[in-house]
């Protein structure tokens, strides 16, 4: 994604350049009405002032009035067309296109990105970009085109009366406007800091709402409130600093704004007194003075608003548009799984210069083999799973599925070939039907219900007031841990992928649920290559082979019975079992 702010904006503007061009033309016509009106009014005043009531050229007066009416009518029509195109054609498409692209790119980021960044912060950055894009469009059209058209036409009409006067006014106005624009650039760093802290505050707020149960259960509301207050205080101080410099610059702009009007007023009378400027010319300059001074001031104000919006977009893109850690390689092809054998070949992995978690790790998993991973926390079990899912990339060696390097295939095809049941079930705040169907988005209701029955969650679902149409709440909080996990397993059953990964998939289940689930897992695992991280003996006994890991290395390998006979590390875990769980602590 483009990280340069102006290139980012132009990328989307050029997709609607014809609509944008029509908008600019209609806006220019609309803004030309004011100086044209002033010019015609001065002509009408000239006709009246140069003749008495008996000698007024009513034909000339009538023509000017007719032209004035036509111009005002054209301005109204142009304004109506502009508003329609802007609100119906331009803004909806513009914002929708940017929203879709941001959504797509954000979801290309690695799991590490989402683990390290607060969800609320990401959302705040997206909102800042979308809102600031609209502000920049508005400020460029209204804040720049409006004053430019007004100033140029005003100078042109004054030049018809006196070219020298027009030149003097134009130069003075250009100097003052430039001075205002330059001084307002000082607000940029203040705006950027405020935008950054505001996003952090919003992220903290969302994080607190997401974890409301945790805050209440630990009685730590006062602690969270204090932390939020500290962050909010920093944000408020940044806003004060921004507002302070902005207020000073606004005062300076207003002063210069009035200076332009006063200068034009004085010059009109000087030219009238010394150089014979007509009464109509004086009226013209005075009438245009307010519009020109307002336009010059508007240029400065809008320069500051654009700078602020620029800072917010820049801040957002620095996070959201950073290069993706995990990307499909050039020419990546879809993964084709026929057998589903898996090979880890001399795999090395470490993160940010830390000690290696895996060093020349080798493991071959045959087609349809069920592998159980056992070991202390930090032994490397979860790392293996994340590398196989390509949540992270290996630092050396390779991982193959059916002799295809997973780094050379598309991530989408890789993930569609693997059904993953994590320790903590992830559910959307949607209906149970939608959550299970996520395993196969085209599945019928009957197929969803069949999967739910195999996962032994059909009975508790039908007991809910709305059955399969019941909402599960934020992250599934309306359900118990065991119920959430059974829905997660039903989703994996529906997906029916050739490779199955179980990451403590039954750890959250009570003994009765676990009894039913073990039977459904037997059906689920048939004909699939399975990798399971498990501590339940009932799960481990079903594995064809157990891999005991320590410090990223395999220290034992064999079936449950074989490893017990060896009386090694697994035997030690087994002897420390408690209530059906082996102790790996």
Map each language-model feature to its residues.
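Juxtamembrane loop-to-helix connectors within ABC transporter transmembrane domains
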Residues: 83-87, 105-152, 210
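An intracellular "coupling" helix at the cytosolic face of ABC transporter transmembrane type-1 domains
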Residues: 14-15, 111-112, 128-137, 141, ...
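ABC-type nucleotide-binding domain
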Residues: 329, 335-585
